[in-house]
Amino acid sequence: MSGRARVRARGITTGHSAREVGRSSRDLMVTSASPGDSEAGGGTSVISQPYELGVSSGDGGRTFMERRGKGRQDFEELGVCTREKLTHVKDCKTGSSGIPVRLVTNLFNLDLPQDWQLYQYHVTYSPDLASRRLRIALLYNHSILSDKAKAFDGASLFLSEKLDQKVTELTSETQRGETIKITLTLTSKLFPNSPVCIQFFNVIFRKILKNLSMYQIGRNFYKPSEPVEIPQYKLSLWPGFAISVSHFESKLLFNADVNYKVLRNETVLDFMTDLCLRTGMSCFTEMCHKQLVGLVVLTRYNNKTYRIDDIDWSVKPTQAFQKRDGSEVTYVDYYKQQYDITLSDLNQPVLVSLLKRKRNDNSEPQMVHLMPELCFLTGLSSQATSDFRLMKAVAEETRLSPVGRQQQLARLVDDIQRNPVARFELETWGLHFGSQLSLTGRVVPSEKILLQDHTCQPAFAADWSKDMRSCKVLSSQPLNRWLIVCCNRAEHLIEAFLSCLRRVGGSMGFNVGYPKIIKVDETPAAFLRAIQVHGDPDVQLVMCILPSNQKNYYDSIKKYLSSDCPVPSQCVLTRTLNKQGTMLSVATKIAMQMTCKLGGELWSVEIPLKSLMVVGIDICRDALNKNVVVVGFVASINSRITRWFSRCVLQRTAADIADCLKVCMTGALNRWYRHNHDLPARIVVYRDGVGNGQLKAVLEYEVPQLLKSVTECGSDARSCRLSVVVVRKRCLLRLFASTDHTVQNPPLGTVVDSEATRPEWYDFYLISQTANRGTVSPTHYNVIYDDNALKPDHMQRLTFKLCHLYYNWQGLISVPAPCQYAHKLTFLVAQSVHKEPSLELANNLFYL
């Protein structure tokens, strides 16, 4: 057994029916780790005890195509052309205002012959062959294809040269003597900018990176041979690259960026053993399911990742399964024979991963059994991400400066061009690497911050915290009736904190009265009980001084005060108040958050467009129920864009999301009308949280629902014009300012709307944040609908202005404020509340 067949030995566990193990009608896949990843021995872990438990159903995994082709982008978006319907930018979508700046990108030209074409053939076999490998072997045996550049995925054949006939018939014979008729039918002549060609180019480059000894994990490629170890936290970082080939404004370009994969030097068996010691046996299996199902593990022998969908406690390593050839072998013997690995725990359960078929294949998913001691956990746990020192250690290794990033990119291109196999692959298809793309961007002017008593031009455009000292906010509500709930050992901190809070509040124009202080035991139940007893309807705000950052404290308080008893709440850690040296800045931050939660306004910027409503939409999955989608909708309700209407809805399908947006928009328009006695003249919606391949759904389902909500608000709504902008923070493009033979981060306010953008979209990139360390990331904006017909300069400038209006930070952020508000709202609901917040809080930024 060799190659992929050796990697994937399939069979059925003896003594288990298909119903019992939850397998599909197809064979079982078995995988393992490589030799040396596990210590040989006959010891037994503390979890090695028999459990008479059934197999849970799991919640499904990623599709089989995603498993095999995770690096591919979702090429459905290549067919979504929105610019042609936007008449005001059909001929030109670039702006002109701002100071020109010379930029270097992480894009590289790919040169093709002028008359280059790709020929696509549909291949059929009679009789049909189930084995993809056999289909490829029989086809490639024919001399008609021997001297041609070719690629075959089992159904479609791609050639760089056209065959003589439109339909070509070939005959092959298998080793068993069976005659197979192969028919090749020309289906398409493809040009370089066609979606199929773009997908094809990406396949070629994935193959090239594999030739450079990189391994594909998820969407990206990594070098396990060059790990960066962080031993104090038992972590390994694999350096690698995210890549993509696409057709930009007028060129085919190769896009690459440096990426790191975080791996834990801890197996699932190690994790289970530690969990058992911490929780005890009574709830061990339940906790295993809760903490492991949904995680992604790596089997290091083939550097492939799998999602844990279930844990089967009834299957042990000593049990046998049936291989393809019909023989039976135990898991123990299989790993020993194939990889010289001795399993150390013979009573460990097996992890179950479900691999679904292709998108249009309705068959049941294929089931994979994995050995816990051979599976390494990937990524960082929530506990790890809250560890400041750990995250700092990771950041020190992964945050590359612009110069360091450029050096890594240059090395990648050099490796491709120097590698004979990679170079031959490119030349075979007529591809040649060109120069790195340089272009001219523009830097838009910085903004003035408008306060109650004066206007300030920040000394440092990205942060105006120092400029706001002793300045009054635009408006605030006095806080007279409020509670502080704390444990006994935090009592001595309260007076000093209150004194500081009232002092900074007064200087801001936020009057803070003396609260009612309630002391409780150090348990989540005690805090919640005190709030339930003392939280009468007249209470304006509840502050809880929490003894620790245990999630159950925060979750129980936020859930009760966001939904069951709607009152704005503020949670503060005791250790935060213990830092006397930072008390002033802590009190200022808290005073600003409390002002917003009571309906106050902190600052604004000049908005030339009158009667403008801006909307931010974001979605995420609920942390407890992954089938539930949390939709956050935040809309401005006044002309200076300082007051907000916030709504959060829980849904299950894309159609439900579109329907709920109509309800949310109607509520926002009604709230605007109540506040302004008229409907807005313009609405600009910023839609965040759009994954790859979802752009078409947003355009076809969500935009019509938003339009319908506007038109159904009455005759006045006919003059209300709508724009919808899709926002993406995680884009592959990087920009570097080129100065004096070196590179650095571009200036704040840099806009790119040519050469690195897409010809079929009205899109642009904007840098609205700074990076003190590392390389700054631009945010991508794609205007998919625009009744407002705003000029590119105006749309770009408005977007930049909105990045100044996030009240949880006295500075610029990477996305427009309504998007960040929607993100904060969905995160709170998805992680802590798990149900829709009360509409009584909709007029306040209660989630800051």
Curated annotation (Swiss-Prot):
UniProt KW keywords: Cytoplasm, Developmental protein, Differentiation, Meiosis, Methylation, Nucleus, RNA-binding, RNA-mediated gene silencing, Spermatogenesis, Translation regulation
Output the PTM entry.
Arginine methylation by PRMT5 is required for the interaction with Tudor domain-containing protein (TDRD1, TDRKH/TDRD2 and TDRD9) and subsequent localization to the meiotic nuage, also named P granule.
Q: Name one GO biological process term.
A: transposable element silencing by mRNA destabilization
Compartments where found:
Nucleus; Cytoplasm
Which coarse location class applies to the principal site listed for this UniProt protein? nucleus
Function recorded in the entry: Plays a central role during spermatogenesis by repressing transposable elements and preventing their mobilization, which is essential for the germline integrity. Acts via the piRNA metabolic process, which mediates the repression of transposable elements during meiosis by forming complexes composed of piRNAs and Piwi proteins. The PIWIL4-piRNA pathway acts in the nucleus and mediates silencing of active transposons: engages with nascent transposable element transcripts and governs the piRNA-directed DNA methylation and subsequent repression of transposons.
Supply the name of the protein.
Piwi-like protein 4
Organism whose genome encodes this protein: Mus musculus
Q: What is the lineage of its organism?
A: Eukaryota, Metazoa, Chordata, Craniata, Vertebrata
